[in-house]
């Protein structure tokens, strides 16, 4: 419980009902991943309203599918591509649809679909996030973040590089 409280913001600690936090605490699959607290247990994906969705997914996702998706998260990406229709016109205010609502309706705007994917992945024990700088949806596989592109045919591996800056001081006038 302390780990969960440590990963959410102080505002979420104050504003989120205990029932929501208990749902995430009691229904998050255990993992020895170093990413567990931040990217599996954490109920916060983006700026959505926090809801108790993990118990719902625990009872509504087929266990065989859950195992298959955990072994290969690309299976989950493909399922979301095939099963969730995108209709941005239905949400002109851009208020995030709750993950359970996306599951039941099978329709979402792009942002709600992205939050849904991360929420469902985390519910299955897959480390996932919306990358904070570029806002890319990603899951972690074998220690590497993999970009999720719902339009592409294959997963996109995040490219890493190294930036070196040097500075040579000059005398001031």
Residue ranges and their predicted role:
Residues 99-107:
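Conserved short loop/turn motifs at secondary-structure junctions
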Residues 93, 107, 126, 133-136, ...:
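An acidic- and aromatic-residue-enriched active-site/binding cleft used to recognize and process polar
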Residues 1-89, 101-102, 112, 122-130, ...:
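N-terminal accessory/pre-domain segments preceding catalytic cores
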Residues 92-99:
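Short, conserved phosphate-binding/catalytic loop or strand-edge motifs used
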């Amino acid at each position: 419980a302390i780990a969960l409280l440590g990963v959410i913001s102080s505002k979420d600690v104050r504003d989120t009902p205990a029932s929501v936090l208990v749902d995430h605490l009691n229904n998050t699959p255990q993992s020895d991943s170093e990413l567990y607290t931040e990217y599996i247990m954490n109920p916060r994906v983006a700026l959505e309203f926090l809801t108790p969705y993990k118990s719902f997914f625990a009872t509504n996702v087929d266990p065989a599918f859950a195992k298959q998706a955990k072994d290969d998260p690309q299976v989950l990406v493909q399922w979301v591509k095939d099963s969730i229709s995108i209709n941005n016109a239905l949400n002109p205010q851009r208020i995030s649809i709750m993950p359970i609502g996306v599951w039941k309706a099978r329709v979402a705007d792009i942002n709600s679909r992205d939050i849904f994917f991360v929420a469902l992945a985390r519910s299955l024990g897959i480390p996932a996030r919306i990358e904070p700088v570029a806002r890319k949806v990603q899951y972690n596989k074998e220690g590497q973040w993999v970009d999720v592109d719902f339009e592409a045919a294959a997963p996109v591996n995040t490219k890493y590089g190294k930036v070196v800056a040097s500075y040579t001081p000059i005398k001031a006038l």
